Amino acid sequence: MENVINTLHLSGKVVGTPVVGHEAFGEKFYYLTLGVPRLSGAQDLLPVTLSERLLDGAMLADGDALTIDGQVRSYNKIIEGAGRLLITAFAQKIVENDEHENPNQIQLTGTLCKAPAYRTTPFGREIADMMLAVNRAYGKSDYIPCITWG
């Protein structure tokens, strides 16, 4: 697949304090939670990974308003003896702001890993669950669970 797309644009507020999550090639990566409002007024708490280079010496604090541009990434982690697929917003650009017009978007192009599973929720909504493989550089892929409806 030549035209691979994996982009996200999220605006929200930092929830809690960012923590150093890991280090790769001498570069620290921070984990934080971003509270992103839905149109309904509910809030999603989304995990974000960002490089110390994006902070440029500053530190983010609880309640800071941010807009993040980046990609959806996935990785496997053993938690309590079982493998789990974890999904994170990998920030490639951050801007501190106070605007929340709900510009949140994710665009993905990939390959379906298995046939979509059609089901009806307890509230009667018809949905399809699927797993999308999105390629990235150096032969890696992100496996992203998706739900479609409507």
Region locations from a protein language model:
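Single-stranded nucleic acid-binding surfaces, predominantly the OB-fold ssDNA-binding core
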Residues: 1-150
